[in-house]
Amino acid sequence: DFVRERDLLEDRGFRAEQMGLRSEVIESLFRVILWASRDHQASLGAEVSKETASKTVAIIGGNGGMGKVMTRLFSEADNNIIISDLDTTITNVEAASQADVVVIAVPIEKTIDVIQEVGPHCKAGSLLMDVTSTKSAPVKAMRDYSKGTSVIGTHPLFGPSVHSLQGQRIAIVCLRDEHGWDEWLTTILHGRG
């Protein structure tokens, strides 16, 4: 609760000044403690039901920066993970054809090409999503190159260096969802932070 944290920081800063200490130093120390506490709470995760979490998720570009973040996110929620990347034996198409959820986590300049490659091979009823900062072209490509799938574009408002998703924001653009994937994804994201 950010209001309680703010009040705590103000109180500790005030007490530090009363003791002749620099309030900003004490506040900085308490910010680190509060961050560590939030991070630990996020690592415990909110309870996500097995029905919600038991999916096979293919991370296309899973060995890259954002791919690793997505792998951690979905694996911590007890999903089965398939990773395809330049250095894996499984191909993008093989991974996509086996998955309930296909996450495109490749560099921006490769996103459209990869969507064109895997979109036609996604299972009917599956979710095709991306984690690209641009939304218009990837969402349009996912719509055009996949049939019978739900299409959700996401834009994580953070980079691959984050330690946890606690307090992070992700913009979601749900273009097509006839299978309840938007609720599933939102549940997973809230459960992780």
PLM regions with names:
Residues 1-56, 63, 72-80:
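N-terminal hydrophobic or amphipathic helices and topogenic motifs
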Residues 51-56, 98, 125, 167:
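Phosphate-coordination loops involved in phosphoryl transfer and adenosine-cofactor binding
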Residues 63, 86-88, 132:
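Residues in the short beta-alpha loop(s) of Rossmann-like NAD(P)-binding domains
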Residues 134-192:
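Rossmann-fold dinucleotide-binding core
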